[in-house]
Amino acid sequence: MRSLSGIQPSGILHIGNYFGAIRQFVEFQNQYEGFYFIANYHALTSSPEGESLKRNTIEVVLDYLALGLDPEKSTLFIQSDVPEHTELAWILSNVTPMGLLERAHSYKDKTAKGIKPNLGLFTYPVLMAADILMYDPDIVPVGKDQKQHVEITRDIAIKFNETFDREVFKLPQDKIFETVAVVPGTDGDKMSKSYGNVINMFLSRK
């Protein structure tokens, strides 16, 4: 059985990242063949500054290790180091209906909050589908807010398989810890770096 998931390095790691994702990664590394990555291409949709993105990417790698992910048990990698992610995303985009992306909660939520949309944000689910499908995982540990993106991944995989009349892609299942499915931020909304309501993971006692 294989597990795959990732985290954006769009800012300092916060407790929502830990309870919503990384804690699951650590628990699953003794049960599954694990692939966990730093989603630095996804981070470009909200944090395109090169130097800060590079710095944050390194920090998230160190945080993964500090919080218990063991490179002897799981494969850890950076999204941009594997060019096949974007190559597959382009291929998948040609079988992905526009309406499927227009219904994505993440896109609608961010635009409703006044975050200026771009094409990267709109096609985010297609790249996420490529991230997932190229590794044939059985489960995808995600926060509850990402559940729809895994469902979109399944829809894209089904469309691709039907288009080419072959079972090319496995249909992954999301894996969510319901007790911490969505960690609230300081304003009561979902904790998110793009909303500015996070509590950093490694804050001092002060």
Predicted feature locations:
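Active-site cores that bind ATP or allylic diphosphates and position pyrophosphate for catalysis
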Residues: K108-K206
